[in-house]
Amino acid sequence: MSMNLKITKNVNRVLARLNHDFKNIHLFSPKKISSREFDFKKNLNHKISDKFIIKISNYAKYLRDNKPKANNDLWGVISKIVNYKEFLNTVCDAKKNKEKFIELILNCGKENLTYGFGTNRRTYQELFKKKIFREKEKYYFLDYLLSLSEYYKLIKVHNPEQGGWIIENENFNHLMKEIFKKKNILPFKTANYYYGYKFEKDFLFLKDLKGLYAAERLSETYKNNNLSEIIEIGGGLGYTCHYVKQLFDCRYTMYDLPHTSLLAAIYLMISQGVDSVNLENEKQNKKNRIFIKPFWKIFDNKSKSKILWFNEDSF
């Protein structure tokens, strides 16, 4: 190794440490990793059936008619930030104004409806205006992709002392194919205008990687303990639920805030199919394997054994 190359590597190592974002596990050197694979998602153009609209509209009306009394709690704080009433009314009126409803759910990445549990760490407006936020979002994603690849034993575990230049030589698209395509795992169908990695004909986000890892660990626990159901408290948009269903079949129940459970119902029905999801206001049928309920229904749950309770994707 030439002296100049040694000096360059040592300088890169020092700079990587100085500029390291400690939310990342792996060191990235100042050399820019290509950004051409990253962009704002704009390709979700799902056909929404009348059955879908009737089902989600009825659930929204159920939530509106059964909302609990306002208290000085987290839900009250979120309600002041998120325009929940307008969202709820739009979904309730979806049968009358189908175009407005479809426009909202396909492009809600521009809205603040997912405040606190969204796909990105920053809002669309912040990411669009500032390159530094997009760069951080990119590094968070690649950092977790490397960790997930290490978990699957696709690559050796990187030692931070090795520096960022080793990481930059990884073929990220190849790793993505090894994890998703070869395992026949389909990405979660989230809304447009989130910032992520362009993969095949879809997009992947940090929440996809985290949801898949959580699903793998849940699968291990579920099978090793002969359990009968998974219950998630605060399930966000449903990333973990979606990936659990990609890995194995089980009864999966989610409890969450009203507007969050409504959003989860929408995107899980798009991702998993309308008949796979049972909403609280409906009768159960044999096809239902995902159950979505508002948080106050948790006190009606009488099950005591063979259930895995967990919390992963919430505040």
Q: Where are the model-predicted features located?
A:
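Conserved SAM-binding motif I beta-strand of class I
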Residues: 251-257
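Conserved class I S-adenosyl-L-methionine
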Residues: 226-236
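Carboxylate/His-rich catalytic cores and anion/metal-binding grooves
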Residues: 263-264
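Conserved Class I S-adenosyl-L-methionine-dependent methyltransferase catalytic core
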Residues: 82-225
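S-adenosyl-L-methionine
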Residues: 267-303
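Conserved SAM-binding loop of SAM-dependent methyltransferases across substrates and taxa
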Residues: 237-248
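A short SAM/SAH-binding and catalytic strip from SAM-dependent methyltransferases
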Residues: 307-315
